[in-house]
Each structure stands twice: as structure tokens, then as C-alpha cells.
Curated annotation (Swiss-Prot):
Gene3D superfamilies: Aspartate Aminotransferase, domain 1 (3.90.1150.10), Type I PLP-dependent aspartate aminotransferase-like (Major domain) (3.40.640.10). This is LL-diaminopimelate aminotransferase. Substrate binds at Y15, G42, K109, Y132, N187, N292, R388. Transmembrane segments: none annotated.
Length: 410
């Protein structure tokens, strides 16, 4: 008889966003005339930039000709895309990378999960709380943890509370850990880390022979010129950090799917025999075995993001979303809501009014305002009493949602 992976049974409930979807569908069925505005899951709403769309069309046309037809591409990604990323995303930051250190994928969510393939099971993992659920759940799924306690913490994971007192930036763990998840600009709190704050983590990782998984999916939304866009802006980070980036929010690729992982050759691990070994070599081996590469049209579209015209158009969309964030942030502050984020990130993290639980506030907004957000407790126990709103909606919907909330909370 085929046996299941029992680790999946440790997961306490359904993935956060499907549970939100279930509740919204139930409400919509019971209230068919209600106009529900969704400011929950971080899905984009603006169309692809014209330059990106043209590259997409041209690439599809290539597939209709014998001369330009593209079949299997390099598993690591086409050099013309990798070089564009190096030249336009990293060189301006003063970061030098080799083409062999960048891997094109079909999205950073998969990468954040798949990277665990090349790390031993007995590594000690440190995760922020609240946190993007994928970091936590994928470690549970592969069997790195025990059962969850009454708070929802899994045995075998070191949780680093992120709260108002520490500015939602985790403090260095007191115990030695081997893998550290960091996400800045942060999802869900919308906060950012300074170079000095990141330097503490890089120094810790190098001193403890640990590896940082740095999720930079929202770096394009940074407005403060003093805030680093990449972990590699920090001295010593190329020895200890793997960086994940995504085209999903930056360029509206949530339905297109493209991301990248940077694995510097200097990031080393230790074999069971105590030998040093490059994670870059392991990730290349894993990639060539389990992945056939992102599609040719998608990579052509991604490369167009880095053209002068493509980036100008992409930046206009980013600015559109950040104006949405300002509208949400300022509107909530007008009625006395305590808010965080929304300045260098497209997420607004708010304190639930009156000490309500996160899910009670979710139900209140849904039933009384017909507005959908994301309960903070869905991101971890330290998210209880908080709530996330996304700036990725249509402008008119964002304005209407904010007015509904303001009227309800006055």
C-alpha cells in the first residue's frame, strides 16, 4: 500500500489564502448583491507594460518560424536575460555577480520551497514571526519539524518575534542556527531594514557558518534611497546569503510566472564528512535535474522589463500601486488606526481596533464593509491583533474600500 507523507498532516489548517477564499465565497453566495472589494492576497491588477507585452508577442511569433523557433532552453536561463539582470539590477548597486550565479525560475515561491532540497535535514532554521507562510510550511512538509504547540509554533524551528517594540525587525537568535529567513521589504508587515541592521545579520551568519535566505521580492517598491535593495550591498553577504527575486509584483507577472535565485559561488556548506562544498554547484545540479527552465516567451518578456522603455513603463505601475498604499495608509490614520508599512512596500500592516482578534476583524470588514483583507494571525502567532491590506487593487476600488472602512470605524 502506498504511504503518504505524514508531515503534511502536521499543518494545522488550510493554507491561509485558500481559507480566506472559502470565507469570501460563502459570504458572496449568501449576499449576491454585495460588491466585495479585495485588498487581501497580493495579486496585481494592472496590465503588463506595453514594451513587455510586445516582447511577449514577438517571442510567440518566433515560435511560428523555423529560423527563430526555440525549444528547450538552458535550465539556468538564457544569458541575455541573466546579463540584463546583472547590468540593470545589480551593477547600479555596486554588486558584482557572475552569470553562473543567477538562476531563472518560474517564480520565487517555488524557489523558496525548492532551495531546501540542497540543505541537510538537521539544519536549525530561524524564521520571523509573523512571516510569509511558505517559509514555515515548506519546512514542515519536508519533515524538519515536530508537531505544532498550542500557539502554532512547530518544534524544531526557531521563531523570531517581529513586533512593534522591535520595529518588526527580528533580533539575532540567542542560539546558534544554520538557516535564516529574512524578507525585506517585509511581507506581511511592509517594514524595511537598513544597511546597519542587515550588517548585523550578515556578521552573525558569517560568524556562525549560517546561510541567509533573503527574499527581496518587493525591492522595486523601495522609495527611501538609504534602504538596500539587495543583501549583497552588505559587505560579506556573498559568503553567506542566497537571494530570491520575483517579477510577479515588480512587473505584474503573477499570471506569467518568472523569478530568479542568486546563489554566489562563495556560499559554502559542509558535507557529512566535514568537507566544504559550494551550494551553487548543488543548486545547479538540482536545477538541471528537476527543472527544464522558464519558457522562452516568458524570459523574453522578462528581459523587456530591463529595456529603457520597459523599465519606465514598469516604474509607472509601481508608482500607481504605491499611491494606492499612501491612500490606504493615510485614510486609516485619519480614523485613528495604527498603521505600519506602505511607504517602501505595497503592504499596510495595521493594529486591529479595540483589541479585536485578526479573524474577528476580517469578518467585520467582510460583513460590514464588504472589504477583504488578510488576518495577521495567518502569518504566525505574533501576527495576532494585526491585519494586512494590499495596495495592488484598482484605484477606484481602493478609494471606495478606504471610505467604507473609515465610515465603519468612526
Amino acid at each position: 500500500m502506498a504511504k503518504i507523507n505524514d508531515n503534511y498532516l502536521k499543518l494545522k489548517a488550510g493554507y491561509l489564502f485558500p481559507e480566506i477564499g472559502r470565507r469570501v465565497r460563502a459570504f458572496a453566495e449568501a449576499n449576491p448583491s454585495a460588491k466585495v472589494i479585495r485588498l487581501g492576497i497580493g495579486d496585481v491588477t494592472r496590465p503588463l507594460a506595453p514594451a513587455v507585452l510586445k516582447a511577449f508577442h514577438d517571442a510567440v511569433d518566433d515560435l511560428a518560424t523555423t529560423d527563430k523557433f526555440a525549444g528547450y532552453g538552458p535550465e539556468q536561463g538564457y544569458d541575455w536575460l541573466i546579463n540584463a539582470i546583472i547590468d540593470k539590477s545589480y551593477k547600479p548597486l555596486g554588486v558584482s555577480l557572475k552569470t553562473e550565479e543567477i538562476f531563472i525560475s518560474d517564480g520565487s515561491k517555488c524557489d523558496c520551497a525548492n532551495i531546501l532540497d540542497i540543505f541537510a535535514m538537521d539544519n536549525v532554521v530561524a524564521i520571523g514571526d509573523p512571516v510569509y507562510p511558505v517559509y514555515n510550511d515548506t519546512n514542515v512538509m519536508i519533515g524538519r519539524t515536530g508537531e505544532a504547540d498550542e500557539k502554532g509554533y512547530y518544534k524544531g524551528i526557531v521563531y523570531m518575534p517581529c513586533n512593534e517594540a522591535n520595529g518588526f525587525i527580528p533580533e539575532l537568535p540567542k542560539e546558534k542556527v544554520d538557516i535564516i529567513y529574512l524578507c525585506f521589504p517585509n511581507n506581511p508587515t511592509g517594514t524595511v531594514a537598513s544597511k546597519a541592521e542587515l550588517k548585523k545579520w550578515v556578521d552573525y551568519a558569517n560568524a556562525n557558518d549560517a546561510v541567509i535566505f533573503f527574499d527581496a521580492a518587493y525591492e522595486a517598491f523601495i522609495t527611501d534611497p538609504s534602504i538596500p535593495h539587495s543583501i549583497y550591498e552588505i559587505e560579506g553577504a556573498k559568503k553567506c546569503a542566497i537571494e530570491f527575486r520575483s517579477f510577479s509584483k515588480t512587473a505584474g507577472f503573477t499570471g506569467v510566472r518568472c523569478g530568479l535565485v542568486v546563489v554566489p559561488e562563495e556560499v559554502m556548506g559542509t558535507t557529512a564528512d566535514g568537507e566544504r562544498y559550494s551550494f551553487n554547484r548543488l543548486w545547479l545540479r538540482r536545477t538541471t535535474t528537476k527543472f527544464n527552465g522558464a519558457s522562452y516567451p516568458v524570459q523574453r518578456a522578462a528581459a523587456a522589463v530591463y529595456s529603457d522603455e520597459g523599465w519606465k513603463q514598469t516604474k509607472e505601475v509601481i508608482d500607481y500601486y504605491m499611491e494606492n498604499a499612501r491612500i490606504i495608509r493615510e485614510g486609516l490614520k485619519e480614523v485613528g488606526v495604527t498603521v505600519f508599512g506602505g511607504v517602501d512596500a505595497p503592504y499596510i500592516w495595521l493594529k486591529t481596533p479595540g483589541g479585536m482578534t485578526s479573524w474577528d476583524f476580517f469578518d467585520k470588514l467582510l460583513t460590514e464593509c464588504n472589504v477583504v483583507g488578510t488576518p495577521g494571525s495567518g502569518f504566525g502567532p505574533s501576527g495576532e491583533g494585526y491585519f494586512r491590506l494590499s495596495a495592488f487593487g484598482h484605484r477606484e476600488n481602493v478609494i471606495e474600500a478606504v471610505e467604507r472602512i473609515k465610515k465603519n470605524l468612526k
